[in-house]
Amino acid sequence: MRELYLVIAYDTPDDRRRARLAKLLKGFGERRQYSVFEARLTREQWAHLKGKLEALVNKEEDVLAVYFLPPEAVGRTWRIGHEGLKRLEDPDFV
């Protein structure tokens, strides 16, 4: 079964909802920035997470975006900073 590679970013003016979103997403992926997470999920896990996100997000006040990355793009990820973060590969491409 192919895994899905996701980048999830959100913004909400509500502190309580922001904390709940962070707690939910920590259970599915790794925090990369304050409101940005990366996740590697099965389709079943994604369906479960999607349902929880739809129930939590206020469509009138919040913004949440999920970016689906192809597997080959994940191997070409480049990051600087935070020693604890894993570098997936060190690409030399333009």
UniProtKB/Swiss-Prot annotation:
Keywords: Antiviral defense, Endonuclease, Hydrolase, Magnesium, Metal-binding, Nuclease, Plasmid. The keyword Metal-binding applies. Its cofactor is Mg(2+). The keyword DNA-binding does not apply. One of its GO terms (biological process) is defense response to virus. One of its GO terms (molecular function) is metal ion binding. Pfam families: CRISPR_Cas2. Mg(2+) binds at residue 11. Its EC number is 3.1.-.-. SUPFAM superfamilies: TTP0101/SSO1404-like. CRISPR (clustered regularly interspaced short palindromic repeat), is an adaptive immune system that provides protection against mobile genetic elements (viruses, transposable elements and conjugative plasmids). CRISPR clusters contain sequences complementary to antecedent mobile elements and target invading nucleic acids. CRISPR clusters are transcribed and processed into CRISPR RNA (crRNA). Functions as a ssRNA-specific endoribonuclease. Involved in the integration of spacer DNA into the CRISPR cassette. HAMAP family: Cas2. Homodimer, forms a heterotetramer with a Cas1 homodimer. Belongs to the CRISPR-associated endoribonuclease Cas2 protein family. PANTHER family: CRISPR-ASSOCIATED ENDORIBONUCLEASE CAS2, CRISPR-ASSOCIATED ENDORIBONUCLEASE CAS2 3. This is CRISPR-associated endoribonuclease Cas2. It comes from Thermus thermophilus (strain ATCC 27634 / DSM 579 / HB8). The gene is cas2.
